[in-house]
Amino acid sequence: MLLIYNIDMRLHTYLEHILGNKATISILRVLFNYKGKTFTERGLAKVSNLSNVEASRTVDQLEKFGIVRIQPVGKAYQISLNDRSYILNKIVQPSLMAEKETLDALIRLLKKHLDTKKIVSATIFGSVVKGEEKEDSDIDLLVISDDFDYATEVVANASEEISSTFGTRISPIIFTRKDFTSKARNDLIRSILSNHILVTGIELEKLK
């Protein structure tokens, strides 16, 4: 069950053994999101959506690199992050923090382009807001502006930078304020109103 590595892998070329598979990332993400909490192997496997065997094997490997601590408690084992770990603090934690802040960074970039007087409101909606996006999902963006040509231009500029920075695309909908108000009872607009994130401008509810 324990995986044995050459000692030089712990001080030199070891990243592929820590970050090289989905199970390891899943467990590290859970432990990071619930930092300070201890898990049993079974509990950690459940939250990480892994089998007990896969979770146990992965935890053993993480302990070998000093990233987690395993403490026997009765017949069970309790797992927690090793806060003193170099690998955790210098590599794993910054990576997970950057992942967690990706959406906020994307919103800031959008705001840089759309935070102007001619944009009445801009919001993102859809699968990204719900946390259900897939690899090929676009960023659904609703822009309200009474200057369609201007809005189209700034959205195109934002889309280009979003693509080069995040490797994803914007799927925009551009309405005038009047058009948005007239479509307020439309199923799509009602869906957007129920679940969106304001990027800049006036909150949608105030525009109905």
Segments (PLM) and residue ranges:
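Catalytic core of pol beta-like nucleotidyltransferases
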Residues: 2-118, 130-136, 148-208
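Short gly/ser-rich loop at a beta-strand->alpha-helix junction or flexible surface loop bordering the NTP-binding
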Residues: 119-129, 143
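A structural signal for short, well-ordered beta-strand segments
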Residues: 124, 141, 170-172
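Short acidic, glycine/proline-enriched helix-loop-strand junctions
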Residues: 137-144
